[in-house]
Amino acid sequence: MIRKATDEDFEEIFNIINDAAIAYKGVIPPDRWHEPYMTREELRSHIEDGVRFSCYADDDEIVGVMGIQDKSDVALIRHAYVRTKQRNKGIGTLLLQELIKGASKPILIGTWKAADWAIRFYERHGFRLAASSIPARSLPFLV
């Protein structure tokens, strides 16, 4: 079941992000990797800046999260993570479809250039690499 996150979900969102972000260890630039990958303060700051999370719950346990943030002309997909033990079950797809369905603007997604699995995931869902003047570490996607 997909639902909007509530304040009570904060710790679970924090834990899912940091569990799933382990996949980036050794992949992203070393100066960008740290543990936890995202601190509570960073997560709180993103939420205060307008990231609205949706959660996928399985038997009342949140196993996947994905955020969307309104940025004038576009909506940004932010922090798309599924618990490591729950990957490859279609949860990310369901969350992405839900956010796309609710978007009224073009969607932009940024990910690490070296995260080829993430790039393939978004390409499978109709996104394409956008022409970019953004640093080579990350590549944006555009619907």
Task: Describe each PLM feature range.
Residues M1-N15:
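A short beta-loop-alpha structural element at the N-terminal edge
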Residues N18-L43:
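Conserved GNAT-fold acetyl-CoA-binding loop/helix
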Residues E41-S54:
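A short helix-loop-beta-strand connector motif used in the catalytic cores of GNAT acetyltransferases and
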Residues C55, E61-Q69, V74-Y81:
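Conserved beta-strand in the GNAT
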Residues A80-R87, T111-K113:
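A short, internal acetyl-CoA/4′-phosphopantetheine-binding micro-motif in the GNAT/acyltransferase core
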Residues V82, N88-K101, R124:
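Conserved acetyl-CoA-binding loop-helix of GNAT-fold acetyltransferases
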Residues T93-L94, A114-V143:
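Conserved active-site alpha-helix within GNAT-family acetyltransferase domains
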Residues G102-A114:
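Conserved GNAT acetyl-CoA-binding A-motif
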